[in-house]
Amino acid sequence: MQLYTYLYLLVPLVTFHLILGTGTLDHGDALTERRSADATALKPEPVLLQKSSARSTDDNGKDTQMKRIFKKRRNKARGEEELSENAVEFARELAN
């Protein structure tokens, strides 16, 4: 009868140890450090510069991708003055 009592108490502890991979909770929360290290190892590295967000300029230093930016903004972020100043340039780019 005593054997069953010990097994009854021992089985959950062994299972807990096997599931978590380590039984050393008393050494400075080793489980949380290990999990956070594993989680950061699985994160993908950020893309520093995507091709679509790269800007190219012509010889005068003007942005040659204004058409893309203009479509993305849909005229919401521009004032009327800026639109009237660049209307000719936009028309040329749209024609090309």
From Swiss-Prot:
Tissue expression per record: Expressed by the venom duct.
Chain positions covered by the region annotation Disordered: 36-85
Protein location: Secreted
Propeptide boundaries: 22-78
Top-level taxon of the source organism: Eukaryota
Keywords per UniProt: Amidation, Calcium, Gamma-carboxyglutamic acid, Ion channel impairing toxin, Ionotropic glutamate receptor inhibitor, Magnesium, Metal-binding, Neurotoxin, Postsynaptic neurotoxin, Secreted, Signal, Toxin
Composition skew (Basic and acidic residues), residue ranges: 56-66
4-carboxyglutamate found at: 81-82, 85, 89, 93
Binding site for a divalent metal cation: 81, 85, 89, 93
Cofactor details (free text): Divalent cations stabilize the toxin the in alpha-helix conformation.
Cofactor (UniProt): Ca(2+); Mg(2+)
Cellular component terms per the entry's GO annotation: extracellular region; host cell postsynaptic membrane
InterPro entries cross-referenced by the UniProt entry: Conantokin_CS
Family: Belongs to the conotoxin B superfamily.
Other information: The mature peptide does not contain cysteine residue.
Function: Conantokins inhibit N-methyl-D-aspartate (NMDA) receptors. This toxin has antagonist activity on NR2B/GRIN2B (IC(50)=1.4 uM) and NR2A/GRIN2A (IC(50)=2.9 uM) subunits, when tested on rat receptors.
Name of the protein in its database record: Conantokin Rl-C
